[in-house]
Amino acid sequence: MEKLLSITNLKKYFPVAKSSFFAKQMYVRANEDITLDIYKGETLGLVGESGCGKSTLGRVLLQLYEQTAGSTMYYGRTLDTVAPEYVLDTLKNAEKYVSNYHKAVAHAEEMAKKCDALGDKATFFDIQDKNLAACDAKTALDYAAKILGGFMVKDTAKGAGLLLNRYRHAFRAAALQSQIDEHHMEIEMLEGVAEDEPKKAASCEKKIKSHQAKINELENLHKAAVAATEEAEKVLAAERAKYAGDPEFQKYEAMLDDGVDLKRLKYKEMRLLRKDLQIIFQDPYSSLNPRMTVGQIIEEGLITHKFFKRGSKRMKPYVFETMNKCGLQNYMYNRYPHQFSGGQRQRICIARSLAVKPKFVVCDECVSALDVSIQSQIINLPKELKEKEGLT
């Protein structure tokens, strides 16, 4: 099975209010050292008593809560398509990242020796400092090795330069492809307008030709960027071949990871992945805007994530199709959340999440606020949709 998410040593601590300014900061450890892999098409269930951190983990995975430590790698997209800023930053400052790793290891060893020397006299805070130092060293290793690989220990400056050149071309190709897709979407919308309003057909045709000319220009640039990426990969492969028999190089090369580290993404970058990673909240009513109709609630995500332009004639039939999949009738399109029962509201939440065609959905106890009589219906709905859509 193909891996979709890989969580390693994930921690989420919530700070507790200090009793005084000089008091040591204490934390509630909601999630502690969680490591697991989630595979495509899999259904993973988390079982635990109330308050044990199930909902927190789901929200941390989606970066709705910022994780304290650990890594969350997402494999639904490649680094080339997401083009995260942290990759370029790591490569531009490769020697600094390697230096930070060595400093973190030295500090962790120093704290471990200090704690061992104290023996039974070691306090909770001594042990906590030791564990945090070890965690910092692991994080520093992850930050450097997942991007640099073997070049972390051999010829760092040259290797980072070659990797930087390769990623720059790949990121440019991804950016150009995104622009091409946007122009195609504009053309699709204009074709719909021309079809529905014949009077505007001539004006739309002129705009379509303009967009098509831009697409042709961008496609030529995209081909050049792809060719440059392939050439950079050949140079990189030749450089790596020099260290084929070096065990130290191969050890760090094995740590290379082409997944996207969700923890290191900036807000705008994470927003691009929101359509891939969705959540169905526990209480349907509090997660719906009471001032928006069902149609507006479902359309909001489609417009935000550029599936359709606002006002597109083709969006409404798609919304109807999504509603029907989730057991909602077309006449409910203009109704407000307060006009529905609890089970129907949860169907709206499910429709809102699935409309953007996600790859991974967190169901945060999505039936616990519902009557027992309709819980089975709502449980079976995501199960049926999972089989049809290949959800995780």
Language-model features, listed with the residues they occupy:
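Conserved ABC ATPase "signature" region
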Residues: 313-331, 382
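Conserved ABC ATPase signature
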Residues: 336-340, 344
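Hydrophobic anchor residue at the start of the ABC signature
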Residues: 350, 362, 378
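A short, proline-enriched helix->beta-strand linker immediately N-terminal to the Walker B motif
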Residues: 355-359, 375, 388
